[in-house]
């Protein structure tokens, strides 16, 4: 195959992959992609929707390249209905801390008492002074979370347990105080600051409401989708509005913030890590957060199955809002179940007919080690794999599985051919 052609093909592929659609700010208009364009099967989509309906969902949206592929509402919910984000809304607060830092109102390395005042905890002065905004963002304040109400922000509820940065615990109370940090340094409430800096430029709606000791965000599903799209594009809206200019903060927020729980960033949950910890536990578990999801997934998770999933390798965002699916608080496991249905959307059962490559299907993509090939190989086909420089790095006779374990990570081209024809496919090796 011509090397120059392959390199040009790669460049076009990368440009195409990078293009994102952004819906108008002051409109309900939102471009769509037909599932048929993605080779998604109606019966698989029906199975996904049936599962969501059976688990008391209210809303589900899936974006590809910024456009809506799937949008479904259940149980009386509709496009204009607001619903709570629960702890998924923590990611909004993290984003606003990043905005406050880029505007020089604060630094996340500042001690929290600089903005909350001395005596905001029941610790000694030296213990309290050691707690920073960064510790609040990463759930590593060292304050005792084993209290009657983990959301209580009274000083008597905030007691020393370990030095900041040495213990990870999912503790709502220190997080809840971040809105006071913003208000005391910016001079605006979190809601008003968000309205100016986030909601207006992206077209989001919504509001943080105080429910007991917790501030809970309510919005439409499409507003949650807008935030996911903003995150997918690195804090940039529409290509010419870089809302989050502090790229260091942005990148840190969606990567491991510490090594105690590497599956946690700045209030975002991270997939693809070798270990993780979960709320209400000090146990470290081996393995990924969501085994059915791509490794580069980062996700906002909230009580009763609220979730916002962002997958850069697939230019995909999807969300679920709803009631508790199993009459109990859930986080990662339910999200993983939804991923199992999403992975089945592609019509992989289609065969490769004799002399016809139009229906060949690869999965998973992105892939780690083994690439499965779906089809009925009634003729002899060969495969060749090329890197981004157009160099052939592997080849062989096509079977139902290709071993990619020895191939470096990155974007590659797979060529399937016989004496009659050939076809190119993009794959991403993780």
Language model segments and positions:
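Active-site helix/loop module of the DD-peptidase/beta-lactamase fold
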Residues: 103-141, 188-220
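C-terminal outer-membrane/trafficking sorting elements
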Residues: 355-430
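Penicillin-binding protein/beta-lactamase superfamily catalytic region
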Residues: 162, 203-312, 325-328
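Active-site SXXK
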Residues: 66, 83-109, 136, 178-182, ...
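A short, well-structured edge-of-sheet supersecondary motif
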Residues: 48-77, 308-309, 315-319
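Catalytic-site signature segments of enzymes, centered on catalytic residues
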Residues: 79-80, 142-218
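Residue-level detector of functionally pivotal "anchor" positions at catalytic/ligand-binding pockets or at interdomain
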Residues: 19-32, 346-363, 376
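Structured C-terminal helix/loop/strand segments within mature extracytoplasmic catalytic/sensor domains
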Residues: 297-349
């Amino acid at each position: 195959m011509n090397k120059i052609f392959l390199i040009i093909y790669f460049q076009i592929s990368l440009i195409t992959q990078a293009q994102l659609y952004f819906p108008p700010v002051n409109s309900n208009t939102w471009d769509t992609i037909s599932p048929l364009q993605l080779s998604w099967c109606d019966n698989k989509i029906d199975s996904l929707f049936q599962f969501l309906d059976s688990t008391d969902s209210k809303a589900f949206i899936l974006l590809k390249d910024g456009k809506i592929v799937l949008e479904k509402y259940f149980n009386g919910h509709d496009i204009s209905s607001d619903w709570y984000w629960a702890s998924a809304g923590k990611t909004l607060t993290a984003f606003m801390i990043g905005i406050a830092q880029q505007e020089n109102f604060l630094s996340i390395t500042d001690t929290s008492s600089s903005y909350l005042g001395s005596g905001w905890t029941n610790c000694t002065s030296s213990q309290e002074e050691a707690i920073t905004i960064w510790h609040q963002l990463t759930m590593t304040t060292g304050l005792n979370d084993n209290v009657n109400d983990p959301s209580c922000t009274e000083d008597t509820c905030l007691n020393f347990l370990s030095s900041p940065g040495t213990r990870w615990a999912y503790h709502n109370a220190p997080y809840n105080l971040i809105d006071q940090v913003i208000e005391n340094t910016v001079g605006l409430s979190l809601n008003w600051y968000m309205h100016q800096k986030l909601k207006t430029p992206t077209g989001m709606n919504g509001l943080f409401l105080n429910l007991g000791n917790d501030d809970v965000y309510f919005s439409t599903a499409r507003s949650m989708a807008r935030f996911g799209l903003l995150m997918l594009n690195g804090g940039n809206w529409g290509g010419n509005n870089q809302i989050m200019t502090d790229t260091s903060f942005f990148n840190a927020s969606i990567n491991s913030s510490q090594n105690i729980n590497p599956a946690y960033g700045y209030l975002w949950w991270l997939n693809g890590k070798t270990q993780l910890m979960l709320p209400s536990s000090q146990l470290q578990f081996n393995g990924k957060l969501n085994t059915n999801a791509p490794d580069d997934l980062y996700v906002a998770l909230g009580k009763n199955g609220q979730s916002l999933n962002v997958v850069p390798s697939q230019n995909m965002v999807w969300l679920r809002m709803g009631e508790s699916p199993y009459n109990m608080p859930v986080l990662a496991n339910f999200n993983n179940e939804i991923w199992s249905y999403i992975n089945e959307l592609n019509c992989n059962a289609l065969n490769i007919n004799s002399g016809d490559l139009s229906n060949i299907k690869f999965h998973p993509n992105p892939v780690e080690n083994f690439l499965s090939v779906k089809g009925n190989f009634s003729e002899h086909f060969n495969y060749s794999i090329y890197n981004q420089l157009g160099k052939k790095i592997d080849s062989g006779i096509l079977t139902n599985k290709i071993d990619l374990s020895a191939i470096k990570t990155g974007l590659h081209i797979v060529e399937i051919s016989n004496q009659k024809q050939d076809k190119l496919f993009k794959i991403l090796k993780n």
